[in-house]
């Protein structure tokens, strides 16, 4: 559960994230490189570095996270449709959400540098863990 302090840190981090609109695509590229088995969920995508399809999907990832940041008090409702899509239509193994979250942390650390303090990292990790949990809810 996110404390008020965590929520404040998440909002502060997010204000910096939105200055880097390619963070989502970078996280996806890192995901595909580090965990190549995740490519199986994107058979119709050009997965090469700089691909328009990866860049566009990265924008969708960032938009979904932005929606979650705006709805920190009710993530389940904010992410319900996305959870349905991934569970029932796309049938994405929920472990992949955690893998993407790890990749997102690396991208944030790369772009934010010293602004991604241990406290900010811990709060954002709680946030991403909560997002992963909500996205996996429909699998039960």
Curated annotation (Swiss-Prot):
Superkingdom as given in the UniProt entry: Eukaryota
Single Gene Ontology BP annotation: hydrogen peroxide catabolic process
Organ and tissue specificity: Red blood cells.
Residues the entry annotates as binding heme b: 57, 86
Pfam families on file: Globin
Domain Globin: 1-140
UniProt keyword list: Heme, Iron, Metal-binding, Oxygen transport, Transport
GO MF, one annotated term: peroxidase activity
Signal peptide start and end residues: none
A GO-annotated cellular component: hemoglobin complex
Assembly and interaction partners: Heterotetramer of two alpha-D chains and two beta chains.
Task performed by this protein: Involved in oxygen transport from the lung to the various peripheral tissues.
Family listed: Belongs to the globin family.
PANTHER family: HEMOGLOBIN FAMILY MEMBER, HEMOGLOBIN SUBUNIT ZETA
Name of the protein in its database record: Hemoglobin subunit alpha-D
Gene source species: Columba livia (Rock dove)
Gene coding for it: HBAD
């Amino acid at each position: 559960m996110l404390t008020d302090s965590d929520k404040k840190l998440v909002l502060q981090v997010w204000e910096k994230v939105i200055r880097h609109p390619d963070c989502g695509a970078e996280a996806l590229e890192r995901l595909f490189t580090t965990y190549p088995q995740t490519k199986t969920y994107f058979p119709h995508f050009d997965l090469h570095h700089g691909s328009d399809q990866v860049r566009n999907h990265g924008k969708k990832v960032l938009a979904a996270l932005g929606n979650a940041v705006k709805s920190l008090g009710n993530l389940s409702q904010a992410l319900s449709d996305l959870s349905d899509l991934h569970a029932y239509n796309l049938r994405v193994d929920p472990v992949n959400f955690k893998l993407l979250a790890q990749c997102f942390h690396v991208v944030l650390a790369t772009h934010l540098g010293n602004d991604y303090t241990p406290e900010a990292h811990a709060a954002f990790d709680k946030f991403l863990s909560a997002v992963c949990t909500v996205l996996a809810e429909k699998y039960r």
